[in-house]
Curated annotation (Swiss-Prot):
Protein name: Glucose-6-phosphate isomerase
Locations listed in the record: Cytoplasm
SUPFAM superfamilies documented for this protein: SIS domain (SSF53697)
Catalytic activity: alpha-D-glucose 6-phosphate = beta-D-fructose 6-phosphate
Known EC number: 5.3.1.9
Pathway entry: Carbohydrate biosynthesis; gluconeogenesis; Carbohydrate degradation; glycolysis; D-glyceraldehyde 3-phosphate and glycerone phosphate from D-glucose: step 2/4
Amino acid sequence: MRDSSSPARPSLTQLPAWQALKSHFETMRDRHLRDLFAADPRRGERLVAEGAGVYLDYSKNRITDETLRLLLQLAREAGVEARRDAMFAGERINLTENRAVLHSALRAPRGAAVTVDGTNVVQEVQEVLDRMSAFADRVRAGTWLGATGKPIRNIVNIGIGGSDLGPVMAYEALKFYADRRLTLRFVSNVDGTDLVEKTRDLDPAETLFIVSSKTFTTLETMANAQSARAWLLAGLENVPDENAAIARPIISRHFVAVSTNAAEVERFGIDTANMFGFWDWVGGRYSVDSAIGLSLMIAIGPNGFRDFLAGFHAMDEHFRSAPLEQNLPVLLGVLGVWYRNFFGAQTYAVLPYDQYLAYFPTYLQQLDMESNGKHVTLDGQPVDYDTGPVVWGQPGTNGQHAFYQLIHQGTTLIPCDFLGFCQTLNPLPTPGGPSHHDLLMANMFAQTEALAFGKSLEQVQAEGVAADLAPHRVFEGNRPTNTLLLDRLTPRTLGTLIALYEHKVFVQGAIWNINSFDQWGVELGKVLASKIVPELEAPGEPELKHDSSTNALIRRYRARRR
């Protein structure tokens, strides 16, 4: 399903660079990082790149200069640069939904111009940001009052997918900068436990709900929103939820919406003056820097939020202008293709050495897997190569005592990104010993060194280890890693990191010739669930027409749920 004005692209596997990489891989398959570093004492100084405040050391990858040359040639032959320029120009590169892809416009500075269908969307974005700022300032100042006259002290964001993962990740990452007088909670799961536990200790009179749903019809989000409305009304005035005349002015003080569906927002009882919109050219997983980030703006303030946007924009500009050889998203993207398509790596770990980034791997999981988990090309043809990997991770050093064993000595190749900061936000000395941050970063540097170089049998034997134990103490090494170093975790650097990975995912999707901006795989389960709900709720035994397994599961659930 391609733009009829563009010629069909040759199959990825037929591109000259791909064919050259296949041959080159045979010479690289067994080359060890020990040998690559021994042959080039300056390798760790040469194979680095820097942009927008991010320092990338990619020297511990199983590549040579020739590998990198061929990978960048593949990016060029696959049209990465042209597709990048088309995205920034507002062309409708999301072909299956006939939409532009312009999350970059969300962080364009005031006065910039990005036109979609004759409209400068940057001006619209700035207008929404100004409204968000005014609202956030009132909540933070205590002048936005609930229905009983109390100031708001609790903010509960209700959303799912991109309407939840982005805000909760960013809030946790920037909690150091948050107004601690405010309590922020995030509800996403339709499991009632999520809402019950998140509201259990809150005073309804001081609680504001942000309902984030573009259509205001998302099943899980609206179920949670309706239950939250009932909780609020019961806790304030014991007003029946259906008594709209009494309930509406109460709801309007305790609910705001991030949506584009004014009719549904008003039907719910929210004043549309308190509705903050966004656009169909913003995908959910790319929306944390839109009105979806309202909870974050309330937490860190409008100035902090604009710093957050400035970080995104800095990486956007780097991605647009840096030569491919020094372009951070391109380098990360092509290295990922190298391991996914030539080494057959099925998974990829993101390992932030900062506790504030605990939710960052989960956020990237959606960003990457929902974007590039595709099995057909833009033309609708089945791919004959692997696409998106499984993305996962945990903050260091926790992961070292959980799954690093498999990365070091298991039989599965798992490329890793290590993320660290030179300065900590919470300096904490260890009495009589090194600081906590030095301990943390020493572990990060040690892990990348150990993964790269391992420990040979000869080294183990030289330590006097018993012969029967020696094989167990061998580390093969040759496990590839990237290390990303930044000075300090701030709203700006977080925005930069998010944009870096957004564009890395874009680069890989462009090379694989897939649409990174739809998510049809999410839809089928939702459709089937909507058919099963009435069967679960039916007073009598429903006629079930599913497969035998699903029918049996439904019957067992109905029989045992009470």
